[in-house]
Amino acid sequence: MVKRGSKVRILRKESYWYQEVGTVATVDTSGIRYPVVVRFEKVSYSGVNTNNFSLDEVIEVNEK
């Protein structure tokens, strides 16, 4: 189960961060469509370093 502080790899192909690893900032349990907020080291073209994903668009990884 993905929880706050977990390292996750992004599986959404159209995402700027596709196949990148980020840290989960929060997981919303209220039933919204994209409940997982992920924070990245790298910023996108518009200067953003966070994005929302659904639970099936992220996979937890064990990076040291």
Swiss-Prot record:
Gene Ontology process terms (BP): photosynthesis
Keywords: Chloroplast, Membrane, Photosynthesis, Photosystem I, Plastid, Thylakoid
Domain of life: Eukaryota
Membrane topology value: Peripheral membrane protein
One GO cellular component term: photosystem I reaction center
Compartments it resides in: Plastid, Chloroplast thylakoid membrane
Family listed: Belongs to the PsaE family.
Entry function: Stabilizes the interaction between PsaC and the PSI core, assists the docking of the ferredoxin to PSI and interacts with ferredoxin-NADP oxidoreductase.
PANTHER family, A to Z: PHOTOSYSTEM I REACTION CENTER SUBUNIT IV A, CHLOROPLASTIC-RELATED (PTHR34549), PHOTOSYSTEM I SUBUNIT IV (PTHR34549:SF2)
Protein known as: Photosystem I reaction center subunit IV
